[in-house]
Structures are given as structure tokens and as C-alpha cells.
């Protein structure tokens, strides 16, 4: 076996490997974040569930504190799929044409839904931090 063969293989496969791995994620790249991936990214960018200065009491549970903060910011509503959709008496479902507009209007006002549908940058997530 020729000792130069591994070197040639590396020269030929090196660029292919770099190309296959793709570009490294940058803060400007949009990433679709849904459900717990959105929450984890938000905690990673903002620093953690105990970042708030509003109450300096000991946390009984980090997850509970984070969920309460998300609920106050109206972010949790977009993470929970409401499977119990019932119409009250006399209410009719909206025509199918307006469903598209409602869907995009909800995504525009709900950051969690927007990040799931369109993707968020790190800068977008930073705007949701409480400080």
C-alpha cells in the first residue's frame, strides 16, 4: 500500500466533509424553535429561570418559576396546543378563508408561535428577556 494514499484521501475528503457539515450557526441565522426547544433556547440566551429581579425569594422549582414567567409574558399560550376547542352556543366556525389570516395574526402576536413557524434569531430571543 502506498503511504501517500491516506494523505490523498484526506485531501480529497476534507473539503467534502467541510461542505457536508454546513456552515456553523451564527446569531443572525433563523432557527425554528417549537415547544421545549423554544423554552430551552430562551433560557440559554437569557441566562436562566432565576434572572428576574422582581422577587428575590428562594425558588421552589426552577421549572415552575420559568413556566410562571412565561405565562406572565403570554409566551406559554403558544407552546400549548389546545385540543379541547369547543364553540359556545350560537357560535359558528369562521369561513376557511379567514383561517389563514387568523393563523398568521396569531403568529405575529405570539413570539413562541412565530419562532416555531418562521424561526427566530438570537437577537429575537434577546428581545424577550425580562431585563
Curated annotation (Swiss-Prot):
Disulfide bonds join 34-116, 46-129, 115-120. Expressed in prenatal and postnatal Leydig cells. Found as well in the corpus luteum, trophoblast, fetal membranes and breast. The keyword Electron transport does not apply. PROSITE patterns: INSULIN. Residues 58-104 form a propeptide. CDD domains: IlGF_relaxin_like (cd04365). Residues 1-20 form the signal peptide. One of its GO terms (molecular function) is protease binding. Its main location: secreted. It holds the Pfam family Insulin. It comes from the Eukaryota. It is found in: Secreted. One of its GO terms (cellular component) is extracellular region. GO terms for biological process: adenylate cyclase-inhibiting G protein-coupled receptor signaling pathway; cell-cell signaling; positive regulation of epithelial cell migration; positive regulation of wound healing; spermatogenesis. Keywords: Cleavage on pair of basic residues, Disease variant, Disulfide bond, Hormone, Secreted, Signal. Seems to play a role in testicular function. May be a trophic hormone with a role in testicular descent in fetal life. Is a ligand for LGR8 receptor. It is linked to Cryptorchidism: One of the most frequent congenital abnormalities in humans, involving 2-5% of male births. Cryptorchidism is associated with increased risk of infertility and testicular cancer. Heterodimer of a B chain and an A chain linked by two disulfide bonds. Belongs to the insulin family. This is Insulin-like 3. It comes from Homo sapiens. The gene is INSL3.
